[in-house]
UniProtKB/Swiss-Prot annotation:
PTM text: N-glycosylated.
Cofactor(s) needed for function: Ca(2+)
Cited Pfam families: Neur (PF00064)
Keyword Chaperone: no
Membrane topology (Virion surface): 36-470
Coiled-coil blocks: none
Descriptive protein name: Neuraminidase
Subunit structure: Homotetramer.
Intravirion side: 1-14
Primary residence: virion
EC number(s) on file: 3.2.1.18
Positions contributing to Ca(2+) binding: 292, 296, 322
Keywords: Calcium, Disulfide bond, Glycoprotein, Glycosidase, Host cell membrane, Host membrane, Hydrolase, Membrane, Metal-binding, Signal-anchor, Transmembrane, Transmembrane helix, Virion
Length: 470
C-alpha cells in the first residue's frame, strides 16, 4: 500500500467508528424514551422516602432524569405535642463539652457574622445556637464599630448547635438587639427587642410569624434575657427589664401560649436589680439566676410558678459569682439582699441541685477572663461556703464573657430528668484587643454522671485580622 492509500484507509476506519458511535447514542436515546414513556410519570421517575424523627417527618422526593438526580427536601411538621418540662433537673457530677463553634477562627477567612450574646435552646429534636448579629461579617469594613450594643442592623439568627454563625447555614429569627427564644414542643417562639432606647418594642414570633408585641413601659432600654426562655406544658415564660442599669429599674414576667401573651406580672424588688436572667425548668417551675448591675456581686434569684406567682431574692451561697467582685473570703452571702458595692456585672447562671447549687463565674475577679463552675453544698438555701466541686472550662489566660443556662428536654435526651447545660461566650476584639470590631465564639457544656477534667476550651483566634491592619 502506498502512503496515500494508507491515509485513505485510516480515515475511512475513523469515520466509520464515529458514525457507529453516533448510531449507538441515537439508539440509546430512542430506547430510553420508549421505556420511560410507558410509565405514568411522562418520563420522570419519582420515589418518596419518609423518615420519622420524633415530632418531625422529613420527606425526600428523588427525581431522576437520564443521568441527573435531584433531591428535594420537603419539610413537614406534624404539629407534635407540647413538651412537659415538669421533670426535675438531673443531679450531675460534672459537665462535658457539647459543642464549640470556633466562629472567630473560621471567620478570619469564612463568611461568618460579627455577633454577641450567643445562647442555646432546645426543641424535642434539636438544639439551636442563637446569636445577635451586627449585620456585618468578620474581616469586613462593616465590622468597624461593632462594640456598640444597639443598632438598627442587629438581628437574631440561629444555626444548629456547633455550627459557626455563618451566612450559609444561619436562619433569620427576628430584628433585635436583645432577645430570647424557646420551643414549646410544637414551634419556636422568639422575642426580639428593637427600636430606639426610649420607645423600644419587643416583637414575639411563633413559628416564624409575628404574633404579639410588648412596648417599653418605662422608656429606658427595654431588654430581655439574652438566653433561653422556658416552656412548661405549652406555656412559655420570660423576664424583661425596663429602666436604669445602675439603679432601681422595673421588672416583669411574661407568659405566652403559641406566641400570644396570656399573662404578665410585675416583680416587686425594691433595692434589688434584675436583668439578663438565665432561666430553666425544674420541678414544674421556672428558676432564674440573673444579673444585678447596680450593687450586688451576688446574683438575684427569681422562681416563677405557672400561675405567675413568684419568689425573688438572691443566691444564698457565701461565694460571689458576678464580675467584678471582691475576695471570696470577705464575702458573707445573703438570701435576700445585694452584697457588695462593685456595680456593673456580667450575665451568668446557676442550677439548683436539691439544696446545692452549681454556679458559673469568671476566674478573674475584675475582668471577663477565664471561666469555672463550682458546686456549693447547700448554696441554694444557705450562705454556705463549702465548695464540693470545681471545674475549669476556660483558663484565666483567655477571654470569656456572658454565660447562661438551658436544659435538654427528656424527649431529646431519653432520660427521665432534665439535663442541665450551659454556654460560655468568649468575647474577642474591642475594647480589650486592637481591632476595629467586637465579636465572640462559644463553648457549650452539658451535665454528665462523671467528673470531667479541667481544660481550656478557649477561642484561640489569632488577632488582629487583615481588616484591622488597613
Amino acid at each position: 500500500m502506498n502512503p496515500n492509500q494508507k491515509i485513505i484507509t485510516i480515515g475511512s476506519i475513523s469515520l466509520g467508528l464515529v458514525v457507529f458511535n453516533v448510531l449507538l447514542h441515537v439508539v440509546s436515546i430512542i430506547v430510553t424514551v420508549l421505556i420511560l414513556g410507558k410509565g405514568e410519570n411522562n418520563g420522570i421517575c419519582n420515589g418518596t422516602v419518609v423518615r420519622e424523627y420524633n415530632e418531625t417527618v422529613r420527606i425526600e422526593r428523588v427525581t431522576q432524569w437520564h443521568n441527573t438526580n435531584v433531591v428535594e427536601y420537603v419539610p413537614y411538621w406534624n404539629g407534635g405535642t407540647y413538651m412537659n418540662n415538669t421533670e426535675a433537673i438531673c443531679d450531675v457530677k460534672g459537665f462535658a463539652p457539647f459543642s464549640n463553634d470556633n466562629g472567630i477562627r473560621i471567620g478570619s477567612r469564612g463568611h461568618v457574622f460579627v455577633i454577641r450574646e450567643p445562647f442555646v435552646s432546645c426543641s424535642p429534636i434539636e438544639c439551636r445556637a442563637f446569636f445577635l448579629t451586627q449585620g456585618s461579617l468578620l474581616n469586613d469594613k462593616h465590622s468597624n464599630g461593632t462594640v456598640k450594643d444597639r443598632s438598627p442592623f442587629r438581628t437574631l439568627m440561629s444555626v444548629e448547635v456547633g455550627q459557626s454563625p455563618n451566612v450559609y447555614q444561619a436562619r433569620f429569627e427576628a430584628v433585635a438587639w436583645s432577645a430570647t427564644a424557646c420551643h414549646d414542643g410544637k414551634k419556636w417562639m422568639t422575642v426580639g427587642v428593637t427600636g430606639p432606647d426610649s420607645k423600644a418594642v419587643a416583637v414575639i414570633h411563633y413559628g416564624g410569624v409575628p404574633t404579639d408585641v410588648v412596648n417599653s413601659w418605662v422608656g429606658d432600654i427595654l431588654r430581655t434575657q439574652e438566653s433561653s426562655c422556658t416552656c412548661i406544658q405549652g406555656d412559655c415564660y420570660w423576664v424583661m427589664t425596663d429602666g436604669p442599669a445602675n439603679r432601681q429599674a422595673q421588672y416583669r414576667i411574661y407568659k405566652a401560649n403559641q406566641g400570644r401573651i396570656i399573662g404578665q406580672t410585675d416583680v416587686s424588688f425594691n433595692g434589688g436589680h434584675i436583668e439578663e436572667c438565665s432561666c430553666y425548668p425544674n420541678d414544674g417551675k421556672v428558676e432564674c439566676v440573673c444579673r444585678d448591675n447596680w450593687t450586688g456581686t451576688n446574683r438575684p434569684v427569681l422562681v416563677i410558678s405557672p400561675d405567675l406567682s413568684y419568689r425573688v431574692g438572691y443566691l444564698c451561697a457565701g461565694i460571689p459569682s458576678d464580675t467584678p467582685r471582691g475576695e471570696d473570703a470577705q464575702f458573707t452571702g445573703s438570701c435576700t439582699s445585694p452584697i457588695g458595692n462593685q456595680g456593673y456585672g456580667v450575665k451568668g447562671f446557676g442550677f439548683r441541685q436539691g439544696t446545692d447549687v452549681w454556679m458559673g463565674r469568671t476566674i478573674s475577679r475584675t475582668s471577663r477572663s477565664g471561666f469555672e463552675i463550682l458546686r456549693i453544698k447547700n448554696g441554694w438555701t444557705q450562705t454556705s461556703k463549702e465548695q464540693v466541686k470545681r471545674q475549669v472550662v476556660v483558663d484565666n489566660l483567655n477571654w470569656s464573657g456572658y454565660s447562661g443556662s438551658f436544659t435538654l428536654p427528656v424527649e431529646l435526651s431519653g432520660k427521665d430528668c432534665l439535663v442541665p447545660c450551659f454556654w460560655v461566650e468568649m468575647i474577642r476584639g474591642k475594647p480589650e484587643e486592637k481591632t476595629i470590631w467586637t465579636s465572640s465564639s462559644s463553648i457549650v457544656m452539658c451535665g454528665v454522671d462523671y467528673e470531667v477534667a479541667d481544660w481550656s476550651w478557649h477561642d484561640g483566634a489569632i488577632l488582629p485580622f487583615d481588616i484591622d491592619k488597613m
